[in-house]
Amino acid sequence: MTVFVDTSAWIEFLRDTGSSVCNTVDDLLSTDMAICDAVSMEVLAGARDERHLGQLRGLLARASLVAIIAADYDDAAALYRICRRNGETVRKLIDCLIAAVAIRSNAMILHADGDFAALSRHTSLVAHPCSSP
């Protein structure tokens, strides 16, 4: 199964935290992993300078890029409402969009973000076993 790597997991890796999420990203660099444009945008926004931007682009290019389609926005809104209805409000709507793309792609998500923990509790999103909130 493809692993969709969220921005929070990339941050763990880039900071070399030594966490299980960090180590899993390192392991996935040579296997089947995916991102979407929203993850790419968030990671690239953190570039310190042009040189770092180039390094980040090279790193992200190792992942398959899954395009966001129009239906993903409706699905993201539905995921948000499902979580809210179950007593957990997702803090960042972009996480719902990323989750919608991962679900459509039949991929599990690797994350270090409480929003994805909530999404995986109340929707069909599957969290990678090494994920942490």
Say what each PLM segment does.
Residues 13, 42-43, 75, 118-119:
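Phosphate- and divalent-cation-binding pockets in alpha/beta enzyme and binding domains
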Residues 34, 66, 128:
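General small-molecule cofactor/ligand-binding pocket signal
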Residues 1, 99, 103-133:
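Acidic, PIN/NYN-like endoribonuclease modules and their adjacent C-terminal/linker elements
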Residues 30-32, 62-63, 86, 105, ...:
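Structured helix-beta-strand junction loops
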Residues 51-54, 83-84, 126-130:
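Short, hinge-like loop/turn segments at secondary-structure boundaries
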Residues 1-35, 44-58:
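Short, well-structured N-terminal submotif of metal-dependent ribonuclease cores
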Residues 65-112:
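Active-site neighborhoods of divalent-metal-dependent phosphate/nucleic-acid chemistry enzymes
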Residues 6-7, 39, 112:
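A secondary-structure boundary/capping signal
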